[in-house]
Amino acid sequence: KEFVKNILLNLKKNKSTFSPVFIIGCGRSGTTILGNTLSNHPKIKYLNERRDLWHRAYPEFDIWNENTQNPKLYADKKDAISKKNNLLRHLFFREQVLGNSIILLEKLPINNFRLEFLNASFPDAKYIYLTRNGLEVSKSIEKRIQKRNWFGGEKYELLKKYSSDNNILFKTKINSDKEKGMWEWKLSIEESNRFFRKENKGNFIHLSYQDFIDSPSKKIKDILDFLKLDYTENWINKTSENIKRKNPETKKTEDKSLYLIGGDILNKTIDNSYTPY
């Protein structure tokens, strides 16, 4: 299978330019619906949480497996190793070429903690940065924690280590599952906010989940214009017709600890005024 894929890659690759685009956003922020929507475009090859490709090149990034040697949640440019990068870029480019696509779109929420690594490994990359009201994200993560399918492997311990390594302190204890959800969201958005505030504005587009749900046609057009991809009005209407909220909006909570954990950036996402620009 690998052999056949590589033969096909060699036959087709001269007509292609590797164009990686990463969807960035904390888990439960709407990255799945955004990725699935964009994947309908015929010139986009979408990799939806293809951990298998990542872990072939960087096995240490598999934080969900308890048998991983020295697992890494956070990664920056010093973690980018050229031999491993060559394999990762090869695997991604092969997916793009075999998909007859001109954009390779990738989504893996843990990449929020690996933005400096992505920048070093894929200097030609572009980013679609999606943010969502932290109250809604923490509520969604809480449900996942309770189903016991969120903090698999070493993820929880590595988030704690990341927090202490960076001297990130909170004004309240973090005990409940909802508080843990808010804590992960806060760590994640602070990391992406820091990165995008200094990133070249031409390399990324930012949108909120709220705006995507309220004006899907406009937001999809904005993204495709940013990626320089063609579309028809008919395609836009068809692609955006089923985009809607699954759960009611959350604008406030009685749980004061969530505001203490989320801080000012939480309030900005609640009133939909957050921007990294």
What name fits each language-model region?
Residues 1-91, 98, 242-246:
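PAPS-dependent sulfotransferase catalytic core
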Residues 1-21, 142, 149-151, 155-206, ...:
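PAPS-dependent sulfotransferases, especially Golgi type II membrane carbohydrate sulfotransferases
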Residues 23-25, 104-107, 129-131, 206-208:
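Short beta-strand segments
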Residues 32-35, 53-56, 112-114, 135-140, ...:
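Short catalytic/ligand-binding loop motif for oxyanion handling, primarily in non-cytosolic enzymes
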Residues 41, 122, 199-201:
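Acidic-histidine catalytic/liganding microenvironments
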Residues 44, 125, 202-204:
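Short, conserved active-site loop motifs that form the nucleotide-linked donor/cofactor pocket
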Residues 87-117:
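Glycine-rich phosphate-binding loop used to anchor ATP phosphates in small-molecule kinases
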Residues 107, 118-144:
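Conserved phosphate-donor/acceptor-positioning beta-strand/loop module used by diverse small-molecule
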